[in-house]
Amino acid sequence: RDLARFGEMMRRRGVGADGRQVVPGWWIDDINEHDSSAAWARGDFAELFPGASYRSKWYQIDRTEGVLCALGIHGQWIYIHPEAELVIVRLASEAIPLDPDHALSWRRGFDAIADAFL
């Protein structure tokens, strides 16, 4: 639950469930508004998440919809879709640190869930 709460705080620009500002909104804005898309396009994961970027440990996997993800080793995810008002957390222990096929399948599944909320 704590990862979901953290994701929700990120989705709400740093505001916690109790309405308190936990981290400055400008910090969340900085992650969303500044990117490394040119560097990303030349990197190892460009095929996995085309058009994505990375900043401050967060992956911006869909810049048009503001989808933000934290990806951890062995299949951990925090998926944030602001427009759908959705946060999804996936805890896992996949056999290898990063399985591109699994990551793409999970991303498609998360996107489908978000689409159902829109």
Where are these regions (language model features)?
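A short acidic/small-residue loop/turn micro-motif
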Residues: 94-96
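Short, gly/Ser/Thr-rich active-site loops of penicillin-recognizing serine hydrolases
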Residues: 100-118
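Non-transmembrane alpha-helical segments in soluble domains
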Residues: 4-11, 28-32, 57-59, 114
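Active-site-proximal alpha-helical segments within enzyme catalytic domains
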Residues: 1-15, 76-77, 81-92
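Intrinsically disordered, low-complexity regions enriched in Ser/Pro/Gly/Gln/His and often acidic
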Residues: 20, 51, 98-100
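Active-site Gly/Thr loop motif
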Residues: 29-87
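A structural signal for well-ordered alpha-helical scaffolds and beta->alpha junctions
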Residues: 3, 24, 51, 106-110
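Structural helix-adjacent loops and short alpha-helical linkers that scaffold large soluble proteins
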Residues: 14-24
